[in-house]
């Protein structure tokens, strides 16, 4: 029997009773989409998945992206699955160790934006019995609704420039060992403009579509006014009332929609506290006629 339990907070729900390693029926897929629209973040506990099963489940919701910036961290034979891990084998990291440690929404820098992330917690570090490496979210439905009416009016119809290199270099400036992007990688991910407000395809409601990780400029404003407005928006969208933290357990699949949330990874574990998470990125091309 499938059971849905709300977190009781602004975001988050748990769906139990679905085996994601089996083909997902249309009825179950529709249930997941409904809960995803209502709650933004969905946890499926006690799963046992291969990388291919993770990709097959994720593909039921849209086209899967293949990451071009971290090709050496792809799952062998399943390039749509990216490995996020601090484990080192034979002197080499098996995955990207410091992914997502600043507030962002995935693929906002892409002409086709992301619809959802699907992550599988194969190995989760614990200390004194407490799971580490939580993922924190903020609701962009709530952020939009909480904006002053005059600012909503002034920003309506405007667009924001998103740049992948902003996030990448921000991580390097904070000590990440990731190398600078190559010219080919930069060409593959050029800056892209997106509407500052989007109509969410699952809810039909407006969301604030900007984030501290990738957003660099409001195109229609002078530079100083753009900087000041973005600084206000970044602070506003991190209002504690809009936020929710999901704590991992081994075997969890965590799925969230990228249009109405921003998120960050909490890196509260050390290099010897091993974490292994496998990720699929579902693109929003299937939903674009409704955005």
What residue ranges belong to the model's regions?
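Non-heme Fe(II) oxygenase catalytic core, chiefly the N-lobe of the double-stranded beta-helix
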Residues: 2-253, 259-291
């Amino acid at each position: 029997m499938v059971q849905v339990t709300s977190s009781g907070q602004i975001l988050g729900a748990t769906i139990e009773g679905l085996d994601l390693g089996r083909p997902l029926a249309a009825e179950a897929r529709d249930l997941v989409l409904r809960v995803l629209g209502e709650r933004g973040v969905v946890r499926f506990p006690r799963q046992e998945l291969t990388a291919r099963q993770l990709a097959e489940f994720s593909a039921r919701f849209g086209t899967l992206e293949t990451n071009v910036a971290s090709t050496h961290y792809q799952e062998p034979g399943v390039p749509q699955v990216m490995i996020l891990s601090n484990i080192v084998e034979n002197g080499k990291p098996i995955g990207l160790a410091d992914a997502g440690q600043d507030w962002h929404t995935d693929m906002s820098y892409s002409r086709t934006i992301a619809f959802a992330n699907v992550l599988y917690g194969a190995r989760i570090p614990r200390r004194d019995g407490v799971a580490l490496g939580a993922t924190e979210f903020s609701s962009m439905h709530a952020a939009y609704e909480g904006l002053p009416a005059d600012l909503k009016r002034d920003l309506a119809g405007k667009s924001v420039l998103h740049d992948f290199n902003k996030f990448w270099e921000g991580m390097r400036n904070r000590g990440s060992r990731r190398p600078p992007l190559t010219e080919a990688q930069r060409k593959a991910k050029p800056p892209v403009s997106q509407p500052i407000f989007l109509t969410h395809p699952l809810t039909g409601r407006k969301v604030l579509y900007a984030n501290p990780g990738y957003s660099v400029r409001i195109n229609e404003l002078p530079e100083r006014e753009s900087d000041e407005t973005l600084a206000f928006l970044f602070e506003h969208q991190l209002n504690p009332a809009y936020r929710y933290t999901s704590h991992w357990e081994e075997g969890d699949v965590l799925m969230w929609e990228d249009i109405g949330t921003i998120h960050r990874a909490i890196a509260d574990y050390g290099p010897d506290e091993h974490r292994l998470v496998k990720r699929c990125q579902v693109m929003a091309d299937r939903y674009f006629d409704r955005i």
